[in-house]
Amino acid sequence: MIKAAYFPTIIYAKDVNLDNRLFEKAVIDWSNKDKGIKRTNMKGWHRTTEMHKIPVFKPLVDELFKMQNEIFQEEWLESEPIIGNMWANINPPGGYNRPHVHPNSHFSGVYYIKAPQNSGQIIFNEPRATAHMVMPRRKQGEPPPHLWREVRVNPLEGRIIIFPAWLWHCVDPNESNDIRISVSFNFIQKGFNV
């Protein structure tokens, strides 16, 4: 039998060594001065979206561009990546993010500044809506990845995760006794009009 996998959904990840304590201090200072904005964040804080222009975050922005340039090459994309927007999130105990996508972007991602154990997994959902029309019963046990209906990823300090902006995702409630701090961002092709 010939077997081929078409239409894959690629999720990229990379661990980087940056000064997360410096980033944490900057984000907490902002949250003490700025009430934030409401998007998909429930019980959490979401900063306004021009964080990539703030000098203290340049080392992170540089790492994001390195990774995104590699992804653009692998994905055969013309032009070059630009950051559409970037913002910080603080999810206190009980805080979570509702299911959402990121319109007007090609790739979205997250970087974890502070991620205590049990502070909420990011969950990526099966993107093919018609795959839910008739869901077969499966054998007991762990099916191979190509049969999964969702992918759960534990947050890890210093990890960047980048995924297609159209991929539905959410964040589980923070069940730790501490805050989780992350940075979210969107990339688009330079010159692309949305």
List the predicted regions and their residue ranges.
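Non-heme Fe(II) oxygenase catalytic core, chiefly the N-lobe of the double-stranded beta-helix
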Residues: 22-28, 32, 62-128
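Catalytic core of non-heme Fe(II) oxygenases with the double-stranded beta-helix
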Residues: 91-162, 189-194
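Non-heme Fe(II)/2-oxoglutarate
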Residues: 1-78
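Short beta-strand His + acidic residue motifs that chelate non-heme Fe in jelly-roll/DSBH
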Residues: 97-100, 169-176
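Short beta-strand-to-coil "C-cap" segments at the C-terminal boundary of structured domains/repeats
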Residues: 15-16, 187-191
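A short alpha/beta connector and helix-capping loop motif
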Residues: 177-187
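Karyopherin-beta/Importin-beta family HEAT-repeat alpha-solenoid scaffold
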Residues: 2-4, 161, 171
